[in-house]
């Protein structure tokens, strides 16, 4: 019996491109892992992530959660199909004063038109600082990552999935 799995070559390339994006560079977001229904990112916390009161800006947690929950769903969406966040709910539990932040997420459900994922932001000691859920709308091919990358003039991505014998 044949099945499909994520192509490691595809994942390496999308991580490389995502990490090089202007937003990821500005926020210091680095993707550590994308696998079946799961993603993990890290953020090297700097002063630019602080608000006027010198605490972490709440938008940092939101950005981490939006990013990591999107990538957790990515593995479950068919190739050349787009999707976007339509609702992000963030619960801040604790301030972060310094050090590396980690975001982890898992896909909860991926349907034909709506997907749902949940994620956590943790500090270096594994303490949960924020929790969030993301609702995403599944779109068409015009909104896919593959089409966007080609539109930017980059080489086409390797196939997202590869066949396997089960």
Which residue ranges define each predicted feature?
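Terminal targeting signals and extreme-terminal segments of soluble enzymes
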Residues: 1-166
């Amino acid at each position: 019996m044949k099945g499909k799995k994520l192509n490691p070559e595809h994942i390496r390339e999308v991580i490389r491109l995502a990490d090089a994006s202007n937003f990821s560079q500005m926020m210091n977001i680095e993707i550590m892992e994308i696998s079946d229904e799961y993603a993990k990112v890290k953020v090297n916390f700097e002063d630019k992530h602080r608000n006027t009161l010198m605490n972490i800006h709440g938008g940092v947690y939101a950005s981490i959660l939006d990013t990591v929950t999107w990538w957790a769903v990515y593995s479950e969406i068919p190739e050349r199909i787009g999707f976007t966040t339509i609702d992000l709910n963030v619960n801040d539990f604790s301030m972060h004063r310094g050090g590396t932040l980690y975001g982890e997420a898992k896909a909860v459900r991926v349907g034909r038109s709506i997907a749902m994922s949940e994620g956590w932001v943790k500090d270096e000691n594994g303490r949960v600082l924020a929790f969030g859920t993301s609702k995403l709308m599944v779109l068409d091919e015009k909104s896919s990552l593959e089409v966007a990358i080609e539109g930017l003039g980059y080489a086409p991505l390797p196939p997202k999935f590869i066949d396997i014998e089960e």
